[in-house]
Amino acid sequence: MEKIVCIIPSRYSSSRFQGKPLADLCGKPMIQHVYERVLKSELVSYAAVATDDSRIFEAVRKFGGKAIMTAARHRSGTDRIAEAVNSLDLKDDDIVVNVQGDQPIFEPEQIAEVTRPLREDPSLPMATLIYRIVREEEITHPNAVKVVFDRNFNALYFSRATIPYVRDDRHPIAYYKHHGIYAYRRAFLRTFTALEEGTMERLESLEQLRALEFGYRIRVVETLHDSVEVDTPEELARVRDILLGRAR
């Protein structure tokens, strides 16, 4: 049976929120919330934060977590994860989960959701989660990455633009957004990092487009849990309110 490990990529630098992984969230650094939620998944046999910053590395070690130092420059979080897993004893068919370091309230059961396709189909290289959009403003917002997929739930394209374009609005359609949790076959991570940057990846600034542009399948799985990614202090305040609401 394949092993499932989870790597949390985390960077200190951010144009909109410098140092956000270490931002205080209800008495803990945000990255600790992510790490502790990962450990609630019974499927995960190992978890670590992959970072290029000593402050994040030391903070993770301080709360008892595992951390892996990586090179400072990587094209994407997936490339950073690929470097991190080189230090682990993994087989080619083992599964590596990527949970973003800015998703402190993701649901641990989503790890089971995103890994299910790879556990059921050994030929799949990667999978990711999608969520049906309910907030109308997200349909046109570039930070909500839209996705279209075929009848077998293989991604056709991801875009910051509104896709699909509905020419005749008499036919209502459901829009889906990408939820940034991935699962990869360990062997595919080697393949992915060896690929050159894709044209669409560069234009949209979406790493998953590299896989699609070079002909690799990405299975999408609909989750019923919305994502709240912290990119600004305002979004951190929103997450804090959500956590405090749960505590009451």
Swiss-Prot record:
Subcellular location: Cytoplasm
E.C. designation(s): 2.7.7.38
Sequence intervals crossing the membrane: none
GO molecular function: 3-deoxy-manno-octulosonate cytidylyltransferase activity
Protein's GO biological process: CMP-keto-3-deoxy-D-manno-octulosonic acid biosynthetic process; lipopolysaccharide biosynthetic process
Main location: cytoplasm
Swiss-Prot/TrEMBL catalytic activity: 3-deoxy-alpha-D-manno-oct-2-ulosonate + CTP = CMP-3-deoxy-beta-D-manno-octulosonate + diphosphate
InterPro entries found in the cross-reference section: Cytidylyl_trans, KdsB, Nucleotide-diphossugar_trans
GO cellular component, one term: cytosol
Pathway: Nucleotide-sugar biosynthesis; CMP-3-deoxy-D-manno-octulosonate biosynthesis; CMP-3-deoxy-D-manno-octulosonate from 3-deoxy-D-manno-octulosonate and CTP: step 1/1; Bacterial outer membrane biogenesis; lipopolysaccharide biosynthesis
Keywords: Cytoplasm, Lipopolysaccharide biosynthesis, Nucleotidyltransferase, Transferase
Domain of life: Bacteria
Function: Activates KDO (a required 8-carbon sugar) for incorporation into bacterial lipopolysaccharide in Gram-negative bacteria.
HAMAP family in the cross-refs: KdsB
NCBIfam families linked: kdsB, PRK05450.1-3, PRK05450.1-5, PRK13368.1
Entry similarity comment: Belongs to the KdsB family.
Protein name, UniProt field: 3-deoxy-manno-octulosonate cytidylyltransferase
Species this protein is from: Syntrophus aciditrophicus (strain SB)
This protein's encoding gene: kdsB
